[in-house]
């Protein structure tokens, strides 16, 4: 391979596939808390999930994630393992547990540079388990993605009342009766 091909390969970030020895994941436990999401946030009306990653009763990290309201995808907002516990497979083991609990594609939300290697390994491992990690979702793409379940978002009562009022005004006007603002 000549120098130009090597440079192109690096520019495209097409690293040669590395052979990784198959090793079992460490035993971890997830302690999960479910919290409601606020209206007009990404996963609303589905709850947000926050899991502590435990190893022999010690907290080694956490995962912040959520299942979308359609139930067809898990979004991983953040996975963090304390520095002294990194590179032991705890984060990967936590993702494997989440993937087993929710057999739907998993989507990382905005992968930071330092996590690219982790997600590459996670993608390979979960694919071997028959699970899929989709391309990351950037912050600028969240609103567009959330449109897929907007039909499930309950309409606030004040907005419903305003909408119904204007429907009534239009029906009254169509019937030739005065209605709406400014009627005396």
Model-flagged regions — what are they?
Residues 2-27, 35-69, 73, 104-184:
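Terminal substrate-recognition subdomain of acyl/acetyltransferases
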Residues 72-83:
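Conserved acetyl-CoA binding element of GNAT-fold acetyltransferases
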Residues 81, 87-100:
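Conserved acetyl-CoA-binding loop-helix of GNAT-fold acetyltransferases
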């Amino acid at each position: 391979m000549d120098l130009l091909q090597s440079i192109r390969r690096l520019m495209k970030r097409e690293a040669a596939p590395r052979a990784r020895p198959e090793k079992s994941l460490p035993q971890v436990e997830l302690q999960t808390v479910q919290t409601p999401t606020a209206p007009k946030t990404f996963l609303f009306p589905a709850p947000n999930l926050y899991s502590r990653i435990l190893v022999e009763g010690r907290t080694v990290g956490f995962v912040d994630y959520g299942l979308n309201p359609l139930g067809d995808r898990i979004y991983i907002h953040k996975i963090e393992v304390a520095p002294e516990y990194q590179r032991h497979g705890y984060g990967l083991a936590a993702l494997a547990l989440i993937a087993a609990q929710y057999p739907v594609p998993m989507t990382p939300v905005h992968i930071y540079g330092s996590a690219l290697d982790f997600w590459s390994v996670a993608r390979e491992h979960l694919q071997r388990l028959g699970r899929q990690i989709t391309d990351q979702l950037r912050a600028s793409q969240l609103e567009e993605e959330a449109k897929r379940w907007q039909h499930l978002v309950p309409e606030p009562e004040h907005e419903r009342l305003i909408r119904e009022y204007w429907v009534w005004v239009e029906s009254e006007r169509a019937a030739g009766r005065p209605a709406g603002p400014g009627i005396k």
